[in-house]
């Protein structure tokens, strides 16, 4: 099938690779423009652009798709389907209408739950037992289109956003290949009006831990914001990111550190920290963090006040 692929971050790369491996003709890859990155602030191509170029595929990275030139360029590709996954630009109606069989979006949630920008983070932060991937026929609304295929997965009790991200990326890659192979047999099912929730973009202000909250909420925050932006607390004046956790038991006032293993008391219950990162340092296991720190039992982490 003649496709246009539209994606930008790491999440999208396995999908592009799967479409190529399945023998689809990729007429063009669209991705966000290169951004300044690294210490030298040199322009760096997106993960999708870098992989597409390595595969020998043509790449376009327009700043907008609304100009007459951009619309004509897209229509000229004469694609049957556009596959869209975490592209980052809103597609105008003329783009949605250009492929003869429409635009298909890979969305990392079980729609209509968690429409929007951060469905993986929000599913973990909300304590959802399950999430998954949907293949949706795109329309003008935000993740409102009818669903062609869906597959659910359980969220592990210690799973982080990074881990779930990789699982859902692989699942989405397999599901879109299967969907395209069976496109003539699949029925697009409208999303129900009940159960709609929105996965708002993560605000860094959410990331500071409030140790007065129940351990379940703190654990979900830590896992849901790992690795980015990373839940954090203060040890003295030093910011410490908390990147892995599990539910534990300990007593004391909220924020109290207990050792062997590294645990922190919450409003109710406690969390055990499994991965941490001091400001300017590499990610460490809790054991390595304790070996390199002068933390004593009873030390207080300062949380959100």
From Swiss-Prot:
- Cellular component GO terms, alphabetically? cytosol
Organism superkingdom: Bacteria
Q: Could you state a single Gene Ontology molecular function term? A: methionyl-tRNA formyltransferase activity
Q: Which reaction does it catalyse?
A: L-methionyl-tRNA(fMet) + (6R)-10-formyltetrahydrofolate = N-formyl-L-methionyl-tRNA(fMet) + (6S)-5,6,7,8-tetrahydrofolate + H(+)
The signal sequence is none
Entry keyword Transferase? yes
Report the EC code(s) recorded for this entry: 2.1.2.9
Q: Which UniProt keywords apply?
A: Protein biosynthesis, Transferase
Which positions bind (6S)-5,6,7,8-tetrahydrofolate? 109-112
The record's section on SUPFAM superfamilies has: FMT C-terminal domain-like (SSF50486), Formyltransferase (SSF53328)
NCBIfam families associated with the record: fmt
Family per record: Belongs to the Fmt family.
**Under what name is this protein listed?**
Methionyl-tRNA formyltransferase
Q: What is the organism field in this record?
A: Roseobacter denitrificans (strain ATCC 33942 / OCh 114)
- Taxonomic lineage of this organism? Bacteria, Pseudomonadati, Pseudomonadota, Alphaproteobacteria, Rhodobacterales
Q: Corresponding gene?
A: fmt
